[in-house]
Amino acid sequence: MVLPTTKDATAAGAGFDTVRIIGDIDALAEKHAGHEDVFRSAVSRLLKAELAKVRDAAQAKLLRDRHGRHCAEWLCFVQDEIIRLSFSAATRHLYHSPIPSDGERMAVVATGGYGRGLMAPESDIDLLFILPYKQTAWGEQVAEAILYCLWDMGLNVGHATRSVNESIRQARRDMTVRTGILEARFLTGDRALYDELISRFDTEVVQGTAAEFVAAKLAEREERHHRAGQSRYLVEPNVKDGKGGLRDLHTLFWIAKYVYRVRESHELLRRNVFDVREYRTFRRCADFLWSVRCNLHFATGRAEERLSFDLQREIAVRLGYTSHPGMQDVERFMKHYFLTAKDVGDLTAILCAKLEDQQAKPAPVLSRAMSKPPGAEVRRVPDSDDFIIDNNRINLAAPDLFKRDPVNLIRLFRLAQKNNLAFHPDALRMVRRSRRLINAQLREDPESNRLFIEILTSNDAETVLRRMNETGVLGEFIRAFGKIVSMMQFNMYHHYTVDEHLIRCIGILQDIERGDNDEVALAGELMRTINPEHRPVIYIATLLHDVAKGRPEDHSIAGARVARRLCPRLGFNAADTELVAWLIEQHLTMSKVAQSRDLSDRKTIENFAAVVQSVERMKLLTILTTADIRGVGPGVWNGWKAQLLRTLYYETEPVLTGGFSEVNRAQRMAAAEAEFRAAFTEWSGHELNAYIARHYPAYWLKVDLEHKIRHARFLRASEQSGRKLNINVGFDEARGVTELTILAADHPWLLSIIAGACASAGANIVDAQIYTTTDGQALDTIAISREYERDEDEGRRAARIAEIIEQVLEGRLRLPDVMPSRAAGKRLRPFVVEPKVTINNQWSDRHTMIEVSGLDRPGLLFQLTTAISKLNLNIASAHVATFGERARDVFYVTDLLGARITAPTRQAAIKRALVHLLASGNTAE
């Protein structure tokens, strides 16, 4: 990295008057002569106060000019001065040696991140005390004096004291030490010791070991990405260690320094590692990431490196982002962040390409594992004279082939896919430089569009589309897609940026088509039976279903408009274009109906059938819905949701076919019972028959096999123990929840009591599956957010919930007496969800449906059920779901006489009461 010159740093650090502070330290030495401990404490207090003033000034300047790298340089300069002052105080006033011996020499050196000359406000300080020989009493005293001064100031200091010989020995065998010395920067003391270390390091450690170092750093990078999250598009990224973060830039520069022996980042231009545009990108990325990191540290007062939801909005405001129609300020900031992370990935690929170029020359740069194998030859790609195969990677046969025929910008990716070839870094670099050739003419070209559909519908489309996206080709070719590249949705439900989500959905769709995943068995079965002509339809609908995110209007409706404009260009006829548009417009419908409607109510099925209108469209919508839910992130798809979709599909099929179904309800009941009998062999046939009769058909059709078996064991254990109320605890690591299965005598207020008990124990309900047995027992499975790391602690919390439920049911406890006053948790505070209450009688002939949506918070379900009961309504069934920070609960209700709520004035009163309840918990910071 470029270091500040003395002149620049001094100017930047105006307000830190080194000369004055030296005078103050001298005065303290005179005042406290003979009292070393008092003098040390006084110096620490003085320097701490001066540093605090500088940090305040640095933060104010950062908020004004938003130049993160300048802020990091300023803070580093001041820290350098503080270390020099503490060294001066130690050697002039505490351990002064008028005629120092050869052993009384020391160089104080900055290493690691501090050695780069850039420092975030709460960063650690890494120091190396270099001695000529072994440790001496004088050296130990001086080093301790400096360290205690820094520690007393509240700074985090990592340190080592070594001779030059020992430093060289350790650098040879320890890559961490080697990297630290690579970044070493002289601070104060004996310059000759530092120069000796660097000279010997270059000749005795670095020389001839470039391949080893590069391999180690790239392996370290992969391990770091694995720990921080492999995707650079995770929506709560680690600014320092995440993919596309500052550490990746540092790794680039470490490799460049080691291989090319450069000291300053601008030397990368002279060595032709980067061209001018790429170097500017390097500097721009560094400045932006340093701005984010410095603001994170200032905002939290700690070395916080993760851009969590509760910090993203504050950092966006600090950096001056404003909201635009369809996009919040925080979403615009995070889009900039992810675009920067993408640029960092591009720079990494460019450096790797340069290193591979070097490998072809005599100077050894890379290890054999990264170089061309002996005998590797360059040959033409089959069916093309424009591309070559270089070490099993596709490359350009001529540098001007994109200019000669811009269709080659699409053809490159199709040929790589067709021939199972990796991409040569040089080819990707040329693609990035040629993106401007993708114009209206190329977008309308029939051949380029044919090639794109082949890419989309052929093997390994996810990998190829991701390469197209990373190089910018996908966003230029489909401009609507370009608008959602690196777009983050500011919510806790989606795990990835919009473009990454869509590309992952294509990969999931191909998993579904291969049929090798039992978790999506229904979608796999349907994929094999759709009209073959509709295969491209489901692929393009999957790629485009969220393409209109970030617009002011409903993204489903806007996305359908995009499809109607785009699909004819891609070769779809009018009927298929309209089918794609319909799938995009309805892509949320099936999930919503399955998870928040009563699937045992005939009206629900009829309404859904009226939307889909044909079995073929329902098949396609089921496949798209499955891919969409699975693509949201780990743990979002589960057995409950799979079973609900299956139930909705097979309940609707007979309505669409006039009574005919490939699998009718009776057959599905028989199949579900047979599946349970085959899997659960612990009971006799008589016991199984009796148990199966305890559940209504809806239970057997909607509950997945794993939970059916768990419930059977639980009910048997409860009977044997004689307990009227029992709770079984399970842990779902994939979803990050604890499942409470509650068996109790059915009670009109039972759901409210369960919700209140969970709230009183600090448990937040995120999902609920509620059933009643034929003998009047309630069997409710409640998923609560996991609070504790250890299962034992979660188990104790569950026991507390069971105790509260039992005491309330027996009349020994009133819930209001144990309900805490809880605001939204820290994770929810940044979010605002507009309260929404919908009341209608169209989804049921027997009940009125009340759908509420708002910001989730502890105790919300208890508050809602209590409010509904106080409104003189009976809850017939409830469908509880949480999507990140958003709660969406549906209640099927009647009045106390069992009638639906039809009076507009009564509906309005219910709506007002529930909206007020939801609004009382809305928050944002």
Swiss-Prot record:
Domain annotation ACT: ranges: 739-820, 849-925
Source domain of life: Bacteria
Cytoplasm listed as a keyword: no
Annotated stretches, region: Uridylyl-removing: 383-738
Sorted UniProt keywords: Hydrolase, Magnesium, Multifunctional enzyme, Nucleotidyltransferase, Repeat, Transferase
Catalytic function, reaction form: [protein-PII]-L-tyrosine + UTP = [protein-PII]-uridylyl-L-tyrosine + diphosphate; [protein-PII]-uridylyl-L-tyrosine + H2O = [protein-PII]-L-tyrosine + UMP + H(+)
Domain HD: 498-621
Cofactors demanded by this protein: Mg(2+)
Alphabetical list of Gene3D superfamilies matching this protein: 3.30.70.260, Beta Polymerase, domain 2, cca-adding enzyme, domain 2
GO molecular function terms attached to this record: [protein-PII] uridylyltransferase activity; phosphoric diester hydrolase activity
EC number: 2.7.7.59, 3.1.4.-
Description of activity control: Uridylyltransferase (UTase) activity is inhibited by glutamine, while glutamine activates uridylyl-removing (UR) activity.
One Pfam entry name: NTP_transf_2
GO BP terms, alphabetized: regulation of nitrogen utilization
Chain segments carrying region Uridylyltransferase: 1-382
UniProt free text on domains: Has four distinct domains: an N-terminal nucleotidyltransferase (NT) domain responsible for UTase activity, a central HD domain that encodes UR activity, and two C-terminal ACT domains that seem to have a role in glutamine sensing.
Function: Modifies, by uridylylation and deuridylylation, the PII regulatory proteins (GlnB and homologs), in response to the nitrogen status of the cell that GlnD senses through the glutamine level. Under low glutamine levels, catalyzes the conversion of the PII proteins and UTP to PII-UMP and PPi, while under higher glutamine levels, GlnD hydrolyzes PII-UMP to PII and UMP (deuridylylation). Thus, controls uridylylation state and activity of the PII proteins, and plays an important role in the regulation of nitrogen assimilation and metabolism.
PANTHER family xref list: BIFUNCTIONAL URIDYLYLTRANSFERASE/URIDYLYL-REMOVING ENZYME, BIFUNCTIONAL URIDYLYLTRANSFERASE_URIDYLYL-REMOVING ENZYME
Family, similarity comment: Belongs to the GlnD family.
Name under which the protein is recorded: Bifunctional uridylyltransferase/uridylyl-removing enzyme
Gene that encodes it: glnD
